[in-house]
């Protein structure tokens, strides 16, 4: 793989700015290379203003939503939060429930059984709510509802007001709800569109607190949940999202929530980062619950639980469920690789798979990993009800997934999602025809990114330049995530020692002992053994390795890409 590096001089405006002039030159250089132009843009990245996000108003129907919730609180009406079962829906529900209850609300929460009703507010869900809580007067959705025409109509017939907060793409029309808050509405003029569901929940609760003249800082304590959701849902980290994740990561680091402290203890978390801890520790453990067919109510109660002992017990259970999820994921990945080997197509334009043993809650992970490995659109189906199969789909730059799937209405029983990720249901008998049709659409769209596309380097360094201070300065750029990745470095090093690690010695560590720098390449053992001499150039991300009081610089190399 060929990596490109573009050097852009640091603008003089930045260097004369009284605040930016005190910022590490490396940090400014990375931002200049990434195309930032003005001092104001850079200040927004480095010093996000969370108060501005909380105060920002203007989303359509937000006033109506707040007015109805205010009336429900004052009239002691039952409110039920109808949430999705993924991290975004769970965290968004937590934000709403804990804040509404803090404001005196009579609040319950409900999510579909993903194996029965799938995604989104539906008539059966409304029926279940009314059976459990027949006094319900308001249903407040989070992370779903924008295409829930039947579900909203079912609630309307029962005299229940529906307040929708969602971030998915709407259709040509909106459901006939009391209020519909979605920054992606066709008639929306709000300047920011890329919220996750929990981000909208945070804005809704802050708007409600202002209307009721409550302390908005109480709502701000829920920023940790909005950050967790934003990272998990892979929304772009720019604008208000970046500010929310920045503040939420700070709250997570403080450990204000007993549930987070319990997760940190169980998983031995020393430092919380959005791109590390949130993405690869918290989010998978929370997502595993619904993926493995467990009740998400346990997770929401856990996130709001004040008792340390109960939190630790639930954290251990979450860890156990996640280990089961990992085992099932590995099994389905192995089957997928065998199926692809049987197809004998080393350079597929897309991947479409189905297996009777796949689980609906796991295929999204498998699709994502296959997409990352082959860099093509991937759709993986699992059995649904008799005669139907349901898939999770993941795409690459160049193919808008939801637009492409909408071009196949003759096959899709149900379909929804985004440009990069979608879910769909088809008749099992149509699988082969659907696969052929989708493959043809991918073939016709020659703008799909292929494997020769590489991310740009942020800087090129020599091992002699690296030290603890250098690496720590990069934390000023956090949080990292979608649209604002962790800095990628080109590194030149004088390797004088090579060590093989892990089961089967399949990993390799290259060491420049003179400069106390090491480079780890996961899965690179066989490639390293095949070379007569170790490489001297690497590409990867820098971090500090702290062990027994000693600190050294470590690069995690892009796998096989040097």
Regions found by a protein language model. Give the residues of each.
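Accessory interdomain/linker segments of ATP-dependent helicases and helicase-like nucleic-acid enzymes
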Residues: 459-517
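Short alpha-helices
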Residues: 95, 174-214, 219-231
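OB-fold single-stranded nucleic acid-binding module
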Residues: 430-435, 527, 531-562
């Amino acid at each position: 793989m060929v990596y490109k590096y573009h050097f852009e001089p640091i603008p003089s405006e930045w260097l004369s700015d009284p605040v930016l002039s005190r910022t590490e030159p490396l940090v400014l250089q990375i931002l200049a290379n990434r195309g930032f132009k003005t001092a104001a843009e850079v200040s927004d990245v480095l010093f996000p203003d969370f108060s501005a996000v909380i105060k920002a108003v203007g989303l359509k129907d937000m006033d109506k939503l707040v007015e109805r919730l205010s009336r429900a609180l004052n009239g002691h009406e039952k409110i039920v939060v109808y949430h999705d079962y993924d991290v975004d829906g769970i965290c968004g529900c937590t934000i709403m429930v804990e804040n509404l209850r803090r404001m005196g609300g009579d609040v319950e929460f409900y999510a579909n059984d993903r194996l029965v009703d799938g995604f989104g507010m539906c008539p059966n869900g409304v029926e279940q709510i009314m059976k459990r809580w027949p006094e319900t007067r308001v249903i407040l959705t989070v992370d779903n509802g924008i295409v829930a025409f039947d579900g909203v109509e079912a609630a309307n017939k029962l005299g229940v007001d529906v307040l929708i907060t969602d971030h998915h793409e709407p259709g040509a029309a909106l459901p006939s709800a009391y209020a519909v808050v979605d920054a992606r509405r066709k008639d929306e003029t709000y300047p920011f569109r890329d919220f996750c569901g929990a981000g909208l929940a945070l804005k809704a609760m802050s708007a409600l607190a202002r209307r009721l003249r409550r302390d908005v800082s109480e709502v701000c304590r829920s920023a940790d949940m909005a950050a967790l959701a934003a990272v998990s849902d892979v929304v772009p980290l720019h604008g208000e999202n970046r500010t929310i994740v920045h503040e939420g990561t700070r709250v997570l680091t403080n450990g204000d929530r007993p549930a987070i402290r319990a997760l940190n203890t169980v998983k031995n978390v020393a430092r919380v980062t959005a791109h590390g801890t949130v993405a690869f520790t918290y989010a998978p453990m929370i997502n595993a619950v619904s993926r493995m067919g467990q009740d998400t109510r346990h997770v929401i109660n856990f996130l709001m639980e004040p008792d340390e002992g109960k939190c630790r017990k639930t954290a251990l259970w979450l860890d156990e469920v996640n280990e089961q999820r990992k085992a099932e994921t590995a099994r389905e990945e192995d089957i997928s690789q065998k199926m692809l080997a049987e197809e004998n197509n080393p350079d597929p334009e897309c991947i479409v798979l189905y297996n009777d043993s796949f689980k609906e809650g796991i295929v999204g992970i498998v699709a994502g990993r296959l997409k990352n490995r082959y860099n093509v659109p991937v759709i993986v189906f699992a059995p649904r009800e008799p005669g139907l199969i349901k898939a999770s789909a993941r795409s690459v730059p160049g193919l808008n997934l939801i637009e492409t799937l909408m071009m196949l209405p003759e096959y899709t029983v149900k379909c929804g999602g985004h440009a990069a990720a979608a879910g769909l249901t088809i008749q099992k008998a149509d699988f082969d025809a659907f696969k052929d049709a989708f493959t043809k659409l991918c073939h016709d769209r020659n703008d799909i990114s292929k494997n020769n596309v590489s991310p740009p380097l942020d800087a090129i360094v020599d091992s002699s330049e690296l030290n603890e201070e250098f690496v720590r300065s990069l934390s000023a750029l956090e949080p990292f995530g979608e649209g604002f990745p962790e800095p990628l470095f080109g590194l030149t090093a004088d390797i004088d020692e090579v060590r093989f690690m892990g089961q089967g010695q399949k990993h390799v560590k290259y060491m420049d002992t003179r400069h106390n720098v090491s480079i780890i390449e996961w899965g690179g053992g066989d490639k390293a053994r095949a070379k007569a001499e170790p490489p001297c150039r690497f590409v990867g991300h820098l971090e500090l390795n702290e062990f027994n009081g000693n600190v050294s610089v470590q690069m995690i190399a892009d796998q096989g890409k040097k």
